[in-house]
From Swiss-Prot:
The EC number(s) this enzyme carries: 2.5.1.141
Keyword Membrane on entry: yes
Pathway: Porphyrin-containing compound metabolism; heme O biosynthesis; heme O from protoheme: step 1/1
Name listed for the protein in its UniProt record: Protoheme IX farnesyltransferase
Gene Ontology biological process: heme O biosynthetic process
């Protein structure tokens, strides 16, 4: 029996799978969940529950390509700091599992294809918004804001708000106030979500020289900012209720109270000098956003009379 002959193909297959997973990791699949959670409800609300399967599918495919392209280019731009941060040291470019030129080519290719896909399958506005989002995320946030100001995620977070704008514009060809309200929800939600995680890994940011707020400010200052932005997030969800029925409004109110309670507990714990668990707020903020936007999707499909 030729044992060597059987082992060699397995090694080749193992290397191929490892390489494939490395390229997949470049795209940050978990980040793309935000696209799905927010874009679908935005599309449903845009036409008050009317479902356009092919149009929605094309929008999601185009949006996912834009998101994966942006995430890949982000990894290229952040390779130097990823190498010195424990949380990101295992990313493909940080451990040189993927050549930088290949990652750059992949990111640019996905970005270009996403633009033409959305333009041809939906409309030009959606394609342009996707292209602007990628450019903003890579050049404005990653290369400029992230390394220069503690307010980096406040303004840079605008890129993460764009899936709702793209989804809305793909259905209507325009941008209306409910789309801006959804944009505001994610815009205000991003700082507490990101800063809660950064509190856990602030030493990483300090070593890398990235001025994330928790790395340059006291915990009391950070949690106060988290509390302010949490209030703004909840307020934005209630503004959106004017375009929905009582169902979404009720869920937004209850979920908002829960989110605010966690933010207040974190702030109170820091003020009292007690041990705190910011990672809990980070994880639960994901659940909060999912609950709000799932309620929006259900509300839109049921199409009950709106509140205004």
């Amino acid at each position: 029996m030729n044992v060597r002959g059987r082992v060699a193909p397995r090694r080749v297959t193992g290397r191929a799978m490892s390489t494939l997973l490395a390229y997949l990791a470049l795209t940050k699949p978990r980040v793309i969940e935000l696209l799905l959670v927010t874009a679908i409800p935005a599309m449903l609300l845009a036409d008050r529950g009317a479902i356009h399967p092919l149009l929605m599918l094309n929008t999601l495919v185009g949006g996912m390509m834009a998101a994966t392209g942006a995430n890949t280019l982000n990894c290229v731009a952040d390779a130097d700091i990823d190498k010195v941060m424990k949380r990101t040291a295992r990313r493909p470019l940080a451990r040189e599992a993927v050549p930088t030129r290949n990652a750059l080519a992949l990111g640019l290719t996905l970005t270009v294809i996403s633009f033409f896909w959305l333009w041809c399958a939906t409309n030009l506005l959606a394609g342009v918004l996707a292209l602007v989002t990628v450019a903003f995320y890579v050049f404005v946030y990653t290369l400029w804001l992230k390394r220069r100001t503690s307010q980096n995620v406040v303004w840079g977070g605008a890129a993460g708000c764009m899936p709702v704008m793209i989804g809305w514009s793909a259905i209507t060809g325009t941008i209306a106030w409910p789309a801006l309200a959804m944009f505001a929800i994610i815009f205000f939600w991003t700082p507490p979500h990101t800063w809660a995680l950064a509190m856990r890994y602030k030493q990483d940011y300090q070593v890398a020289g990235v001025p994330m707020l928790p790395a340059v400010a006291t915990e009391r200052q950070v949690t106060k900012q988290i509390l302010i932005y949490t209030w703004l997030t909840v307020a934005a969800t209630l503004v959106l209720a004017l375009a929905t029925s009582w169902l979404y409004g009720a869920v937004a109110l209850v979920a908002g109270g829960w989110f605010l309670t966690m933010a207040h507990q974190l702030y109170a714990g820091v003020r009292a000098g007690e041990p705190v668990r910011p990672l809990r707020l980070f994880l639960q903020s994901n659940n909060y956003l999912a609950v709000v936007f799932c309620a929006l999707a259900v509300d839109s499909v049921i199409a009950l009379p709106t509140l205004h």
